[in-house]
């Protein structure tokens, strides 16, 4: 079988499974969030927490609940890491240092899962499931809740601007969607050889004759939600390149499907809830065009034979697992950076300049191809409003989307939401590269314009793009254990997560308080090929105008050498 045929078959299989799951999963999630019935276990939780599940919240009440819950989660996870040495199942591990504990707590609560530590030698078998795995569920559920709140903003007509109840949305997303889906995925991964154990580990002798300690952990259960919730943080440092996490080509495809399942299906949920399923298909088409284009670029770049080693191997195999090959590696890399997952089955730092630039651009587009769980949907909806506004200017009409007028307030909130990530990425990268104290942490450096300095800049740009987009993947040549990186990247994760959430919820409240207007002859149609092209162009144009200078100094310059 030729590499091209292998790549084509894997892509076709992934798309076929997603197509089969699209309608049932999307409609199921719509029923979950629209249902008036509460499961018995949900009712018990509401009573224990003194929550009125029938009480509606305005946007600021909803935002306050999101921020309060997330702040409590950060404090709990930070404390758990600091005292893990005196807790059961800690083995020989001590408490985590303050800087790493802060960075990790912020990372997992924001759905970033940036890991500046070796998990198997830092986190205990209690901290992993009780602290980190729990956040894998609830941080994903928070993103889905915000997306659903924005959908309600388009659907509802309420003078008070109520957009739902955060606590109900959080509970339903966790118990009715993420938990059962994760259980099924975990069983499939177990069948492929992914480990599930609370044993501290075992010793073995390597080929060089030295003794090696192999860490064991409850991997399968966390691996499932790691991918399904677009979290990405692995129990093992090698992440999904490790055979304990991702042992076979079949498990690799299962993990890719888990990454894409909910973000793709949420477009169907959106179309179902607003009563116009073509609207969801239009958003899905934009996501598919961007995802497919970057996948083609990455496959072509990594299948090339640049250099003696690549020519001998038949492709750019450095940093890649032979059991996955170029197709499985490229498919995973584009899927994990097009969502907020950040899991890796290869060393992204070893990707070719063009391939590394493609996965970096995937994040800089705003992670909307197809985006993280919930975050991808509300991210592309915000960009859709920008596209409608631009289209309205072209035809001289008041912009409308789904019967709601886009006034100055709505456009301002949409623009602010879009601008948060670029500001964090460019400011963080700029400050880092001019600080002399950070150069020692760059594995690649040198005189200005040299290959080392160019790739070193790409590593810094990638780190801040990953943190600000709540992705979590990294170019491994950059050492991020210093207090500067722990703090700066931690702040980027916080602001990159919660500022857009605040703006999106404010937008949802503003839309919900409006009356619906009937579409007229001058209304821009927002379903179909024309709007698909307009929205795709808007996404690319915003990213190009914002990041082209930075990309020209990094991946583009490196590719041209």
UniProtKB/Swiss-Prot annotation:
InterPro entries: KdpA (IPR004623). The chain crosses the membrane at residues 5-25, 60-80, 86-106, 131-151, 177-197, 247-267, 281-301, 324-344, 376-396, 415-435, 488-508, 537-557. One of its GO terms (cellular component) is plasma membrane. The keyword Nucleotide-binding does not apply. It comes from the Bacteria. Keywords: Cell membrane, Ion transport, Membrane, Potassium, Potassium transport, Transmembrane, Transmembrane helix, Transport. The keyword Transport applies. It is found in: Cell membrane. It is a multi-pass membrane protein. GO terms for molecular function: P-type potassium transmembrane transporter activity; potassium ion binding. Its main location: membrane. PANTHER family: POTASSIUM-TRANSPORTING ATPASE A CHAIN, POTASSIUM-TRANSPORTING ATPASE POTASSIUM-BINDING SUBUNIT. Part of the high-affinity ATP-driven potassium transport (or Kdp) system, which catalyzes the hydrolysis of ATP coupled with the electrogenic transport of potassium into the cytoplasm. This subunit binds the extracellular potassium ions and delivers the ions to the membrane domain of KdpB through an intramembrane tunnel. Belongs to the KdpA family. HAMAP family: KdpA (MF_00275). The system is composed of three essential subunits: KdpA, KdpB and KdpC. NCBIfam families: kdpA. This is Potassium-transporting ATPase potassium-binding subunit. It comes from Rhodococcus opacus (strain B4). The gene is kdpA.
């Amino acid at each position: 079988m030729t590499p091209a045929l292998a790549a084509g078959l894997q892509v076709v299989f992934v798309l076929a499974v997603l197509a089969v799951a699209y309608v049932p999963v999307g409609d199921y999630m719509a029923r979950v969030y629209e249902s008036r019935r509460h499961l018995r276990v949900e009712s018990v939780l509401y009573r224990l927490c003194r929550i009125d599940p029938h009480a509606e919240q305005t946007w600021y009440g909803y935002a306050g609940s999101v921020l309060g819950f997330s702040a409590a989660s950060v404090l709990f996870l930070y404390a758990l890491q600091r005292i893990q040495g005196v807790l059961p199942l800690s083995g020989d591990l001590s408490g985590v240092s303050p800087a790493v504990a802060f960075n990790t707590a912020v990372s997992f609560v924001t759905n970033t899962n940036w890991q500046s530590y070796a998990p198997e030698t830092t986190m205990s078998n209690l901290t992993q499931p009780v602290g980190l795995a729990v956040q894998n569920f609830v941080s994903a559920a928070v993103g889905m809740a915000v997306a659903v709140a924005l959908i309600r903003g388009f659907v509802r007509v309420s003078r008070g601007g109520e957009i739902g109840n955060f606590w109900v949305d959080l509970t339903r997303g966790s118990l009715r969607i993420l938990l059962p889906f994760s259980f099924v995925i975990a069983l499939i991964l177990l069948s492929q050889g992914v480990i599930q154990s609370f044993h501290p580990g075992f010793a073995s002798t390597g080929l060089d004759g030295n003794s090696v300690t192999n860490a064991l952990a409850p991997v399968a259960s966390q691996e499932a939600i790691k991918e399904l919730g677009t979290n990405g943080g692995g129990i093992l440092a090698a992440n999904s390149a490790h055979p304990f996490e991702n042992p076979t080509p079949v498990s690799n495809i299962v993990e890719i499907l888990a990454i894409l399942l909910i973000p793709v299906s949420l477009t169907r949920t959106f179309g179902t809830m607003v009563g116009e399923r073509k609207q969801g298909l239009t958003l899905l088409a934009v996501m598919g065009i961007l995802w497919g284009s970057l996948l083609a670029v990455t496959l072509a770049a990594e299948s090339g034979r640049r250099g003696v080693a690549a020519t001998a191997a038949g492709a750019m195999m450095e940093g890649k697992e032979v059991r996955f090959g170029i197709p499985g590696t490229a498919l995973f890399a584009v899927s994990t950076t097009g969502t907020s997952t950040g899991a890796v089955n290869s060393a992204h730092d070893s990707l070719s300049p063009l391939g590394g630039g493609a996965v970096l651009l995937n994040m800089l587009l705003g992670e909307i191809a197809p985006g993280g769980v919930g975050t991808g949907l509300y991210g592309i909806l915000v960009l859709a409003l920008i596209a409608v506004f631009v289209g309205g200017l072209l035809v001289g009409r008041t912009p409308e989307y789904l019967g709601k007028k886009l006034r100055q307030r709505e456009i301002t909130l949409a623009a602010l939401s879009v601008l948060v990530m670029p500001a964090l990425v460019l400011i963080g990268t700029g400050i880092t590269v001019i600080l002399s104290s950070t150069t020692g942490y760059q594995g690649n450096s040198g005189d200005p314009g040299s290959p080392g300095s160019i790739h070193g800049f790409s590593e810094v740009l990638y780190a801040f793009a990953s943190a600000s987009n709540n992705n979590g993947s990294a170019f491994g040549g950059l050492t991020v254990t210093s207090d500067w990186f722990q703090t700066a990247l931690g702040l980027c994760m916080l602001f990159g997560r919660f500022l857009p959430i605040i703006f999106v919820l404010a937008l949802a409240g503003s839309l919900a308080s409006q009356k619906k207007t009937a579409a007229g002859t001058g209304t821009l149609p927002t379903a179909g090929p024309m709007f698909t092209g307009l929205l795709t162009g808007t996404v690319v144009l915003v990213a190009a105008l914002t990041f082209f200078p930075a990309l020209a100094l990094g991946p583009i310059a490196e590719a041209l050498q």
